[in-house]
């Protein structure tokens, strides 16, 4: 009987971590994210397990284990971050997993009121701020905002190396950020299409004209295409 009484606080902490983690995960599951209900519940429960075990073995330093949990969640969060073209997806899901671990730590320490308050705030951030972010995205784009662009030039296969270096020099001169440079065979046999991924301010007309006019001076380039990256 005494052993059961000793186990009750342990089980209560784990159940609280699981339920609050599941509450956060339910919102992610509803939005069909990779880390949903079960993942967040397990992350919170696992964090609580580590905290409880550290309090059993070394009750004076649970903070040391909490720091290790934060590091461990970094590896788990990296698994849900995906790069699609120039866009990165999964950052919010990874951040939510990190928060779920924090909820688990609070539950493991028996701070249920703080854990519940944090859960409510996390849910508000994921639900209410999502709506706010969508409204902000509908506002006119600031001239200082960054946009992604795709620059494609076509050249003879033998001139590819020289044209690549030419492009690098022009991009550096235009003070625009180059995030990717590659090439593929062009539709016309014997030619290469060089693709540059650029990042610059939304007010890009002057930069575009500078780059295109400079590229046009190169006789080795047979075609130029510039567009905003829609991904």
UniProtKB/Swiss-Prot annotation:
<comment type="similarity">
    <text>Belongs to the MgtC/SapB family.</text>
</comment>
<dbReference type="InterPro" id="IPR003416">
    <property type="entry name" value="MgtC/SapB/SrpB/YhiD_fam"/>
</dbReference>
<keyword id="KW-0997">Cell inner membrane</keyword>
<feature type="transmembrane region" description="Helical">
    <location>
        <begin position="62"/>
        <end position="82"/>
    </location>
</feature>
<keyword id="KW-1003">Cell membrane</keyword>
<dbReference type="Pfam" id="PF21770">
    <property type="entry name" value="MgtC_SapB_C"/>
</dbReference>
<feature type="transmembrane region" description="Helical">
    <location>
        <begin position="103"/>
        <end position="123"/>
    </location>
</feature>
<comment type="function">
    <text>Virulence factor required for growth in low Mg(2+) medium and for intramacrophage survival. May be involved in regulating membrane potential by activating Na(+)/K(+)-ATPase.</text>
</comment>
<dbReference type="InterPro" id="IPR048640">
    <property type="entry name" value="MgtC-like_C"/>
</dbReference>
<protein>
    <recommendedName>
        <fullName>Protein MgtC</fullName>
    </recommendedName>
</protein>
<feature type="transmembrane region" description="Helical">
    <location>
        <begin position="39"/>
        <end position="59"/>
    </location>
</feature>
<dbReference type="GO" id="GO:0005886">
    <property type="term" value="C:plasma membrane"/>
</dbReference>
<keyword id="KW-0812">Transmembrane</keyword>
<keyword id="KW-0843">Virulence</keyword>
<dbReference type="InterPro" id="IPR049177">
    <property type="entry name" value="MgtC_SapB_SrpB_YhiD_N"/>
</dbReference>
<keyword id="KW-0472">Membrane</keyword>
<keyword id="KW-1133">Transmembrane helix</keyword>
<dbReference type="Pfam" id="PF02308">
    <property type="entry name" value="MgtC"/>
</dbReference>
<feature type="transmembrane region" description="Helical">
    <location>
        <begin position="5"/>
        <end position="25"/>
    </location>
</feature>
